[in-house]
Every structure is written in structure tokens, then in C-alpha cells.
């Protein structure tokens, strides 16, 4: 499982070094094979170990293909998906069009989301994290029941 927010840097070629604490698990789970795609809801990228992504592809394939929402989601997620591989130094290359989608520059945040990572522009991550915290503090009663019952 992937947890925590990690400051990472993109080099001039758009490569990121995967934090060492995740490398062993990624090698065990997916032999360093990753999929990166856009996040359909937020201005960030999602990075999945290949087996996790294959589960998503299976679910997407099972959705009713006559629904416009299904086709739209498939176009966004699958159409923007790119295969990546950790190199011998634990680095991976983010393609330019995906870097552009997430407004990635030299400073980024790699955020563990249990079965995947999100990759954010550092300033965008700080802004969304602060906004999320403020929203929860302002309206704690608006949480769905399953989240209110979550023991933290």
C-alpha cells in the first residue's frame, strides 16, 4: 500500500526518481511496470502498478458502452494511459503531454493513495490540500455516513 506525500523533482527530461521506500514493493508487485494517466477529476496524474491498472481496465471494459459517460471516461483514462518502467536507478519518464495536463515543473508531489499514486504540481497540491482541510473543518456534518463512521 502506498501512503504519504513525497516531494519529488523532475529533471530536464521529465524524469522522476521513485522514492526508495516504494521501489521494493513496486518491483515485487509489478516488476517496476507502471501505468500513468490523467486524473479525470483533478489536475494531476495517476500512477498505477500494472496489476492495479489491469483491474481498472477490466472494470472499464464491463461498463455499458452505449452510454456517453462511459465512452468519455474510457477516452480520458485509457486514451491517455502510458506504460512506464522504473529504470535501474528507480526513475521513470513522464511524457510531455501528461506533464502539461498536470502543470508539472521541477517541483512536484507524489501522493500515495493506497493502490496508486497521484502526481501533482507542488503548488496545486498545497492549494488542494489546504482547501480540502478547510472544507472538512467547515462542514464536518456533510460527510457521507460511511466516512463519518470511519474510525481515525
From Swiss-Prot:
One of the GO biological process terms: negative regulation of DNA-templated transcription initiation
Domain SpoVT-AbrB: 5-52, 81-124
Keywords: Cytoplasm, DNA-binding, Repeat, Transcription, Transcription regulation
SUPFAM superfamilies from the UniProt entry: AbrB/MazE/MraZ-like
Subcellular location: Cytoplasm, Nucleoid
One of the record's GO cellular component terms: cytoplasm
CDD domains reported in the protein's UniProt record: MraZ_C, MraZ_N
Subunit structure: Forms oligomers.
Membership in a protein family: Belongs to the MraZ family.
Annotated protein name in UniProt: Transcriptional regulator MraZ
Organism: Azotobacter vinelandii (strain DJ / ATCC BAA-1303)
Gene: mraZ
